[in-house]
A protein has these predicted regions:
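N-terminal subdomain of lithium-sensitive/metallo-dependent phosphomonoesterases centered on the IMPase/IPPase/PAP
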Residues: 4-7, 26, 30-138
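DPxDG-like acidic metal-binding loop motif
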Residues: 127-183
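Structured N-terminal alpha/beta-domain signature
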Residues: 97-102, 116-119, 136-151, 171, ...
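Short strand-turn-strand beta-turns centered on an Asx-Gly dipeptide
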Residues: 188-189
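Residue-level signal for inorganic ion chemistry
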Residues: 73, 108, 141, 170, ...
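Short linear segments in intrinsically disordered or otherwise low-structure-confidence regions
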Residues: 9-11, 19
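An extended, acidic
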Residues: 195-313
Length: 313
């Protein structure tokens, strides 16, 4: 039996989950699990009755989709894309997004024809009931344009405001990180676990920056939080995108990540990765995090309370 944190609309709850195996077809370690999760070895994106697919089946095909989209974006990567106006920037961003979305949307829609589709990856807040695909076809898109390596393709299936599966693909390294509710988080076959660091003063922490159109109060809050962490943590990293920071928290490479406001596509993939890797999620004041929260904190259990204390000053 494994106790897992599951994200609900208004709070987190702890649920005992049994799973017998999750196929190595999409890179998950299976020997740690006992129970009922299985995946058809013959499932293909076409020819599968979506109503019969398990969440493990869906994750396997979601991985296939994000890898295909990532390959298309990798072919567009290399030279710095120059732009002289905001309009030129937006066109360049849209070209990348449309390229990946043209691959992702039909594939994911075939998997769950009745699932909703979040049209704007920058939207935040709670979703209506039911299933929704929350996708960022080029997370870290500006980095891609500047020939920087920190970008990814993400797809998350949300059910009644709980992320149930996510796939994050890093096209430049070929790595794929996955999480399935109750079955852990994995990076290319290796099960992930957050760090065991117990001293914020020895911790590497990270945050993202405010969006260009963000409210001034949020911008000031971001600045104040960075100042506070510079005093208390060992190293403070500030860059985008959020999901890559959260992947690093899940992998134990860094110890905490926080953000103010934030879009669903920024936070939901990483929230599932971190919770399935044994991390703690809350807002920056230590209250249960929900998509309605105005702040977000993901941390290793040993430094979570210290991070809350620092960010609450």
């Amino acid at each position: 039996m494994h106790l897992k944190l599951l994200m609900g609309l208004d709070t987190f709850e702890t649920r005992a989950v049994d799973s017998e195996r999750v196929s190595a077809r999409f890179g998950l370690i299976t020997s740690d699990f006992t129970g009922e999760f299985t995946m058809s070895e013959t499932m293909q994106t076409t020819g599968v009755d979506a109503s019969d697919a398990t969440d493990a089946d869906l994750l396997g095909q979601t991985v296939t989709a994000v890898r295909a989209a990532g390959s298309a974006l990798r072919e567009r990567f290399g030279e710095v894309v120059r732009y002289r106006t905001r309009e030129e920037l937006m066109r360049a961003l849209a070209a990348n997004g449309d390229t990946a979305l043209g691959i992702l949307r039909p594939r994911l829609t075939r998997l769950r024809p009745d699932a909703g589709w979040v049209e704007d990856e920058l939207d935040g807040g709670a979703l209506p009931p039911g299933e929704w695909w929350v996708v960022d076809p080029a997370e870290g898109n500006v980095n891609h344009l500047h020939a920087l390596p920190e970008w990814a393709v993400t797809a998350t299936l949300v059910r009644d405001n709980r992320p149930v599966l996510t796939a994050v693909h890093l096209p430049l390294t070929g790595e794929t990180c996955t999480a399935l509710t109750g079955a852990g988080a994995h990076l290319d076959g290796r099960r992930l676990h957050v760090s065991r660091t117990a001293d914020l003063g020895l911790s590497v922490v990270a945050t993202s920056q405010a969006r260009p159109d963000e409210d001034e109060a949020v911008v000031r809050r971001v600045g104040a939080s960075i100042t506070a962490m510079l005093s208390d943590a060992l190293v403070v990293r500030t860059t985008v995108p959020a999901t890559l920071h959260l992947l690093n928290v899940a992998a134990g490479r860094i110890d905490a990540f926080w953000q103010f406001a934030g879009a669903r596509a920024d936070l939901l993939p990483g929230a599932l990765l971190v919770s399935e890797a044994g991390g703690r999620l809350s807002d920056v004041e230590g209250r249960p995090w929900t998509p309605r929260s105005d702040s977000f904190l993901a941390a290793a259990p040993g430094v979570h309370a210290q991070a809350v204390a620092t960010l609450s000053r």
